């Protein structure tokens, strides 16, 4: 498939704002591929359309930032001054390169047109280049690719290198297109994507005529992590109990979500972003290897513990462990980790369609019970033990007074609150469900992405000291909700400034526009209505709690979350 044919349809998709039209254009693209010589190209097309070369679970990136891309573009013959001016004018490096493509060095008239396979394989190679001269090699490869591209191709190649296509396409739209073209149930393709995290594989299977409902490659598999199921925020324990009828109560831990996979004695541990963190937590791996269980996927919360106080250490200590690459054993001696397991998703077969109560029974057979209402003394001893693997603390009673007592006890031992779960519910990967609720004592902190940064003043003049914060809507579009500068230490500012310089897209002098890659957890006094921002809401007195290196733009809060918190707080007043 010629890359130019692909880009023509991408251009159509980009020019419409209507979701149904985007779906129709992608259906047109599928039909074009279906009748081509290589229908398997749908795999690459599906991934590229959302700005990815690798499947999400592979945890790989092209690894090229805006600065390196700019260097590569300059070597094609485009003057740096013109390039920066055009980026400032258009707000997009892809459009800037397209508009200035007449400056790109010409190649032989007899050179062949770029194919989809060539572009795809070239970009995959970029992620594999390492070593002292890697920057030069990457620059040369990108430059050669742009020299071979026509103007529209150069727009999309530039964006794909930054993994941001800017055409308004997302996974749900591609899944809707699959459903329409292949005449398959939309819920089926959504569920299969949820257990594979591989839109390319799903497209490849559909176009080859596979029976996707029964294809073993499209089932939940060990060592292919899935996105976690997410809880709803609830205004009160009472409201959540009404929604979940005969609920199950568990402690909400102050830690980091992890997924543990084990098969044939091999163990891998993944973060909520599906990152493989196995090498960073060797002591946990060794403990899991000792268990007489195999062919299993477990989910739990990894907590950094202070064994003297029996309370969790700061969340940043967990991130220090997850990010550590050297002297891991020494760090393990300083920061003790444990996992509280609260779900089993696979045990010799997929379990996500079975009720939570059944999954919990399996979990308790493996790790024992931790029933707060009948085993509190045992739990108290375990809190101070050096044991690393537990089942989560659970309350079996629905007595409102006991539930409140359990909630307060969970807070007293340093955790965040409680979870309220429907015991009859299945596990729905990657979705925020109405069968699981979190109850916390204070306003819910928000995870937001930084979209702009501004140079600081006074003591902060050497760093970016103020950050524009955004949340996303259901289509993935970003909406500004405020600016923050408080809560950041000098170490934080230094770290953020370094990242900003690597991901800035446009320089406006004292302010820069960024790729949406920095996630901050912020607290605030309240959410208020505001005409200043398009979304109609703003954070009052936001303050940074921590830099969430364990989260990506996929994990940030949504506009709906903001509206819900606003309504909850308004009803409390």
From Swiss-Prot:
InterPro entries linked: ATP-dep_DNA_ligase, DNA_ligae_ATP-dep_bac/arc, DNA_ligase_ATP-dep, DNA_ligase_ATP-dep_C, DNA_ligase_ATP-dep_cent, DNA_ligase_ATP-dep_CS, DNA_ligase_ATP-dep_N, DNA_ligase_N_sf
Alphabetical GO biological process terms: cell division; DNA biosynthetic process; DNA recombination; DNA repair; lagging strand elongation
Key words of the record: ATP-binding, Cell cycle, Cell division, DNA damage, DNA recombination, DNA repair, DNA replication, Ligase, Magnesium, Metal-binding, Nucleotide-binding
PROSITE patterns recorded: DNA_LIGASE_A1, DNA_LIGASE_A2, DNA_LIGASE_A3
Catalysed reaction equations from the record: ATP + (deoxyribonucleotide)n-3'-hydroxyl + 5'-phospho-(deoxyribonucleotide)m = (deoxyribonucleotide)n+m + AMP + diphosphate
Entry cofactors: Mg(2+)
Active site: residue positions: 252
Gene Ontology molecular function, alphabetical: ATP binding; DNA binding; DNA ligase (ATP) activity; metal ion binding
UniProt-listed Enzyme Commission number(s): 6.5.1.1
Record-listed ATP binding positions: 250, 257, 272, 301, 342, 432, 438
Enzyme class: ligase
PANTHER family, alphabetized: DNA LIGASE (PTHR45674:SF7), DNA LIGASE 1/3 FAMILY MEMBER (PTHR45674)
Record-stated family: Belongs to the ATP-dependent DNA ligase family.
Described purpose of this protein according to its UniProt entry: DNA ligase that seals nicks in double-stranded DNA during DNA replication, DNA recombination and DNA repair.
Protein name, UniProt field: DNA ligase
């Amino acid at each position: 498939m010629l890359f130019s044919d692909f880009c023509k349809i991408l251009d159509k998709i980009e020019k419409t704002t209507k979701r149904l039209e985007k779906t129709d254009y992608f259906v047109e693209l599928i039909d074009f591929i279906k009748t081509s010589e290589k229908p398997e190209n749908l795999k690459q097309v599906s991934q590229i359309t959302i700005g990815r070369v690798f499947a999400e679970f592979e945890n790989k990136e092209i690894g090229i930032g805006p600065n390196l891309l700019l260097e590569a573009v300059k070597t094609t013959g485009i003057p740096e001054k013109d390039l920066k001016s055009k980026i400032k004018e258009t707000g997009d490096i892809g459009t800037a390169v397209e508009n200035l493509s007449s400056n790109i060095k010409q190649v032989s008239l007899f050179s062949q047109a770029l194919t989809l396979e060539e572009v795809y394989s070239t970009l995959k190679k970029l992620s594999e280049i390492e070593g002292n001269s890697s920057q030069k090699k990457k620059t040369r490869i990108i430059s050669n690719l742009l020299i071979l591209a026509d103007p529209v191709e150069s727009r999309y190649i530039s964006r794909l290198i930054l993994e941001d296509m800017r055409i308004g396409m997302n996974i749900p739209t591609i899944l809707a297109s699959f459903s329409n073209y292949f005449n398959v149930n939309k819920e089926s393709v959504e569920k299969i994507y949820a257990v594979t995290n591989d839109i390319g594989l799903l497209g490849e299977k559909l176009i080859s005529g596979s029976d996707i409902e029964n294809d073993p490659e499209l089932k939940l598999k060990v060592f292919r992590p899935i996105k976690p199921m997410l809880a709803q925020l609830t205004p009160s324990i009472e409201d959540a109990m009404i929604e979940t009828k005969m609920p199950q109560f568990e402690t909400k831990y102050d830690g980091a979500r992890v997924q543990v996979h084990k098969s044939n004695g091999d163990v891998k541990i993944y973060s909520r972003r599906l990152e493989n963190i196995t090498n960073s937590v060797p002591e946990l791996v060794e403990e899991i290897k000792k268990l007489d269980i195999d062919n299993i996927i477990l989910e739990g919360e990894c907590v950094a513990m202070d064994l003297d106080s029996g309370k969790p250490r700061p969340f940043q200590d967990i991130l220090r462990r997850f990010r550590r690459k050297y002297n891991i054993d020494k760090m393990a001696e300083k920061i003790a980790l444990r996992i509280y397991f609260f779900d089993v998703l696979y045990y010799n077969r997929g379990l996500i369609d079975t009720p939570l109560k059944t999954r919990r029974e399996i979990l308790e057979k493996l790790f024992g019970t931790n029933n707060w209402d009948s085993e509190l003394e045992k739990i108290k001893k375990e809190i101070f033990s050096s044991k690393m693997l537990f089942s989560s603390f659970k309350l079996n009673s629905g007595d409102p007074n006991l539930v409140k007592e359990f909630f307060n006890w969970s807070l007293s031992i340093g955790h965040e609150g409680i979870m309220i779960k429907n015991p009859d519910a299945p596990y729905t990967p990657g979705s925020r469900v109405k069968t699981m609720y979190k109850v916390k004592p204070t306003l819910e902190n928000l995870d937001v992405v930084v979209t702009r940064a501004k140079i600081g003043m006074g003591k902060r003049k050497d760093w970016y000291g103020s950050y524009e914060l955004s949340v996303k809507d259901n289509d993935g579009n970003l909406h500004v909700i405020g600016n923050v500068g408080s809560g950041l230490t000098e170490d934080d500012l230094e770290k953020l400034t370094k990242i900003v310089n690597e991901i800035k897209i446009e320089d406006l002098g004292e302010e820069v526009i960024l790729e949406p890659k920095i996630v901050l957890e912020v607290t605030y006094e309240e959410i208020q209505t505001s005409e200043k921002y398009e979304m109609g809401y703003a954070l009052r007195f936001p303050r940074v709690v921590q830099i969430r290196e364990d989260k990506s733009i996929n994990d940030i809060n949504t506009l709906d979350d903001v509206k819900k918190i606003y309504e909850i707080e308004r009803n409390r007043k």
